[in-house]
Amino acid sequence: MAFSSGFPFGFFNELVPVYLRSRGTSLELIGLASWASLPWALKFLWAPLVDRVGSRRSWIVACQVGFAAVLAAFVLAEPGGTPFFVLLFAFVALSATQDIAVDASTIELTTKDELGPANGVRVTLYRLAMIAAGGVMVGLSAALGWNRLFLLAAGLFLVLAVVNLRLPTAQRAPAANEPLLEPVRELLASPGIAGVVLFVLLFKLGDLALTPMVKPFWLDAGYSVEQIGWVQTTLGVGASIVGALAGGALTARLGTFRALWMLGGAQALSNLGYYAAATAGAPPGLMYGAAVIEQFTQGLGTAAFLAFLMSLCSRRHAATQFALLSALYRVAGIGAASVSGFLTARSGYATYFLITFALALPGFFFLPAVRRALAARGASA
């Protein structure tokens, strides 16, 4: 399930910027394409439907069939045109719906003590899927062509749909007689929720602001699509897998609170790697080092962050509450990413990467609220 969640995310964040830039799309339009990721932020609006109707497995399989249809349709769409962005929006909407079911299944099938290690494994599979989408597919694009790759990806999702039909689905207590907004009310009534909301909004901001401009930076620095696919994405995402496993283990060992500030601090500092590379003229050593370090620390921080978000959710309302929490940081990230192209075009890559480091810092001011919230829920702090 984690693999099928990671592929769409890798497709959107790793492959699409390379595809658009290699076809001559402007930095401004690539940045604005971040708005197509809005369904990831708004998925809490239909999460109650996923909570109440059907099984987790049925939602996942239906979305995977939808992925196959949309990927096949990309063959007919001009890159950067309106039909392309409509299809991209539909692709993300399917991904967001699938994520609701996958996230809820993870919460329902694990105990709180298992969340750290479970999310380490989950992020690992997620990152492997990102390698498939953003590394293998990008690396093969010159040899096979983009249209053939889209059709191959469509076939992959049909295979995944068949595989997922055989997976177990968690049993959950019915909530049909509860008010529709009960999951939201329960979450908002939690102790210290205001500080928690601000932390969730800001923790991943620097990371999400950085992502849309990384691949254009590689292309504009003179690196080939093959190098981006096989080195920047595959090597980098491979490092993030190691980071995710280490992050899951460290979260279990350190406790969620200490993992958040220690691993989150490493995640923030890693943005300076791309700043150094841009300042020095993008030499291979610094570029490869920046990719590996940024992805490794992203894996560290993400494992701790997911464990924290899941510790805030009740099992009964897992889909809705996790969707609402994840929407918070995605909304902030979309806002930052949407202006990334404009800022980069006007200030240059080096200055923009320095800005993303600054954006990663404000969330740490709200860690005391996080500690209180974890203590109130009996989670490890």
Please tell me what each predicted stretch does.
Residues 1-40, 194-199, 203-217, 229:
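Helix-loop boundary and gating motifs at the non-cytosolic
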Residues 42-55, 242-257, 344-345:
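Helix-to-loop junctions at the C-terminal end of transmembrane segments
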Residues 52-65, 252-266:
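Cytoplasmic membrane-interface "Motif A"-like loop-to-helix N-cap segments
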Residues 61, 65-79, 265-282:
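C-terminal ends and interior cores of transmembrane alpha-helices
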Residues 154-173, 366-371:
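C-terminal membrane-cytosol helix-exit motif in multi-pass small-molecule transporters
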Residues 169-198:
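Juxtamembrane intracellular "pre-TM" segments in multi-pass secondary transporters
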Residues 258-305:
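C-terminal transmembrane helical hairpin of 12-TM major facilitator-type secondary transporters
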Residues 316-344:
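A late C-terminal transmembrane helix in Major Facilitator Superfamily
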